[in-house]
Amino acid sequence: MCPGRSWVWNTARMDTDINVAVLGAGRMGEILAAGMVRSGVRSAGQILVTDANPQRVEEVASRHGFVLRESNSAAVQASSVVVLAVKPKDLPALLAEIAPSVGAGHLIVSIAAGVTTAALERGLGGSAAVVRAMPNAASSVGEGITAICAGSRAQEKDLNVARELLGGVGPVISIGEAYIDAVTAVSGSGPAYFALFAEAMVDAGVTVGLPREVSAQLVAQTMRGTAALVTEGRMEPAEVRAAVTSPGGTTAMAIRELERSGVRAGVLNAVQAAFDRARDLAGGSTGSR
């Protein structure tokens, strides 16, 4: 996000106590804003959006009925909650732009990976409450999970507001900021891990003779059903594996090969690598990708 112009589509007087400014109309910004409307915690007319790309923000506003503002600062001034949904590399310029407009009554919610609440507070230079959030890609279908943590000035009421707003795309959990990089490595990147395994499963099905579309359908529903066993059936992952694995059976042979191939170690190493990268980004204060 850079300082830039956008257009006002709705000039009606709005209650700034309930307006939410979403600065950054990229994929995740759109998903979160749409989730607020879908869950009923805000109407489309209470969502103010901006983006450095005029065409993109017009498309998003038109699709959902959001309000466009002429600048980031104007959106902040007309809102009590501000969601920072830009890439980490664009955050310093955005913070510098909006800092004069941010006051003690604002709640700032940032989804920028690798940017600490302390860095956000320094960049804003004021007394606003800051909450850091880590959603994931499954939020687009209302099945995400978002972890939030409070900055030094955020109170429980601020976390409650963040939970309410972000809850439209899935469950919200509160954690200490020390855990946020681990959350990034597990759930933030997690959909990609499962997708990679599913991709390999589909290819494997084709290898043993299934038509690709049949293999893809089998894998997708098997993933959905397995997730339901864990979330709705209250089974531990190890219990699911044990329940399916008969002594000397086909699943037992398959699990043996997966273990021989180092799948478990590969997962551990992958999550560690993601965690280390998240720490590297956080070490840069405002991060970059």
Question: Where are the regions that the model predicts?
Answer:
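NAD(P)+-binding Rossmann beta1-loop-alpha1 motif at the extreme N-terminus of oxidoreductases
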Residues: C2-E70, A74, V206-T207
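NAD(P)-dependent Rossmann-like dehydrogenase/reductase catalytic/cofactor-binding core
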Residues: R5, W9-D15, A220-R289
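Rossmann-like NAD(P)(H) cofactor-binding subdomain of soluble oxidoreductases
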Residues: L48, P54-Q55, H64, N72-I148, ...
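Internal alpha-helical scaffold of NAD(P)-dependent oxidoreductase catalytic cores
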Residues: A119-A129, I145-A182, A195-E232
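Catalytic, metal-anchored helix/loop core of enzyme active sites in primary metabolism
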Residues: V186, A198, G284-G287
